[in-house]
UniProtKB/Swiss-Prot annotation:
SUPFAM superfamilies: Metallo-dependent phosphatases. This is UDP-2,3-diacylglucosamine hydrolase. Keywords: Cell inner membrane, Cell membrane, Hydrolase, Lipid A biosynthesis, Lipid biosynthesis, Lipid metabolism, Manganese, Membrane, Metal-binding. CDD domains: MPP_YbbF-LpxH. PANTHER family: UDP-2,3-DIACYLGLUCOSAMINE HYDROLASE (PTHR34990:SF1), UDP-2,3-DIACYLGLUCOSAMINE HYDROLASE-RELATED (PTHR34990). It comes from Xanthomonas campestris pv. campestris (strain B100).
Length: 247
């Protein structure tokens, strides 16, 4: 049996081929597995469960179909879809996990994260994250009319793209540092939780890293994004493997 991990699909009506790839993945590769974990950024943006979206409806229907076959589906919010709430979770048949979460994965304690908490060198983003994860902020935002939420999301996305462009045009080494995990934070996280494996997404740099932390040999698995292809981590009792899914 196998447990599947994915993240950073960034599903968007502007990229229907990726949505179709995901729906095909749910139909053909998830049934019969032990569980499916979605570690954030399933959607490019999410401004409330009440937002009309035929694509989100199709995704919810497909996820619910998987869950009804007996495969547990878990969702951890990312930096793009942290406002996914209980109403959508019920429709999709998944359980929302806090970030981070420790699970027992075939006898090995494993820390699951979206991954943005490890990017502590990006101090501006960490401040934004702290603000937007505040329950009072979220309640106030979700109480606004849909049009106001759409406008805010568009402004936030434009600001994010502008900042990314500014960073890319600057020092390349600085860009790589700011947009990737901070090694010191990775080490501290391994020590804090006292375990030897972390699985996360967010950085779009799929890889399996072997690091030393707290005097132990540890594994950090980074999930891939779904822009030019799909990406899935398969874990069973014998090991793990990152795989690409062709469009």
């Amino acid at each position: 049996m196998t447990t599947l991990f994915i993240s950073d699909l960034h599903l968007d009506p502007a990229r229907p081929a990726i949505t179709e790839l995901f729906l095909d993945f749910l139909r053909t590769q998830v049934p019969g597995s032990d569980a499916l974990y979605i570690l954030g950024d399933l959607f490019e943006a999410w401004i409330g469960d009440d937002t009309p979206s035929t694509a989100a409806d199709a995704v919810a229907e497909a996820l619910h179909a998987v869950a009804t076959t007996g495969v547990p589906v878990f969702f951890m919010p990312g930096n793009r879809d942290f406002l996914v709430g209980a109403a959508y979770a019920q429709r999709a048949g998944f359980r929302i996990l806090p970030d981070p979460t420790v699970i027992d994965l075939y006898g090995q304690p494993t820390l699951l994260m979206h991954g943005d908490l490890l990017c502590t060198d990006d101090t501006a983003y960490q401040a934004f994250r702290a603000q937007t994860r505040d329950p009072a902020f979220q309640a106030q935002f979700l109480s606004q009319p849909l049009a106001a939420r759409v406008a805010f999301a568009q402004q936030a996305r434009a600001a994010s793209h502008a900042r990314q462009s500014e960073l890319k045009q600057g020092d390349q080494a600085q860009f790589e540092t700011v947009t990737d995990v901070a090694p010191a934070e990775v080490d501290a996280t391994f020590v804090r939780y006292g375990l030897d494996r972390i699985i996360h997404g967010h950085t779009h740099r799929p890889a399996i890293h072997i690091v030393q932390a707290g005097g132990r040999t540890c594994t950090r698995v980074v999930l891939g994004d779904w822009y030019e292809q799909g990406s899935v981590l398969r874990v069973d009792a014998d090991g793990l493997a990152l795989e690409q899914l062709a469009l």
